[in-house]
Amino acid sequence: MKRENLHQPFEISFSELDESLLKEHEHTFFELVYILSGTGIQWINNNMFPYHDGHLFMITPGDTHSFEIHTTTKFVDIKFNDIYIHSSVFGAENIQRLEFILQHANHQPGCILRNKVDKLLVKPMIEAIIREYINRNLYSKEIITQIINTIIIVVARNIAMFLPEQVDECSEDKSLDILQYIQANIYKNR
């Protein structure tokens, strides 16, 4: 199986496809895939989900996925890695919270935008990224970066809203403490 890597903090790409070029593969990074137009099926970790315009998918590191295209589909891909999340753009106090929430995205197949208001919010942001990317005006890179940051936060909100247990300051901190303890001690005494 093909495994993709990302060698920069984030990358944006646009494509229009009549058929799937990439078969089942996995990443070492996060990927947001926005469907501008088209229909088909997204396969992720052996689960399928029909897609159409306006859907946003979150693919986390280690997920196995592919797209089965039924009608010509326009994709916007936003790829980012842990380096991007740990950069100063999100602020030190938000990094652990954001990372925790994003890592839980793989438990939620299908369109990540479940809040109707956020669906209406994300579409013009994606369109703004496309305009800035094509026109390359003064400060375009900075504007794109800020829009990506906002989309990531909107995605995190949608994930947090539908986690199995309510994520609040206490439950999230406890979960993080448990995960950190396990990670730090899993290979001790072996």
Predicted regions and their residues:
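A hydrophobic/aromatic-rich effector-binding and dimerization subdomain
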Residues: 1-11, 68-131
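Tight coil/turn sites that cap or link beta-strands
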Residues: 19, 53-54, 62, 81
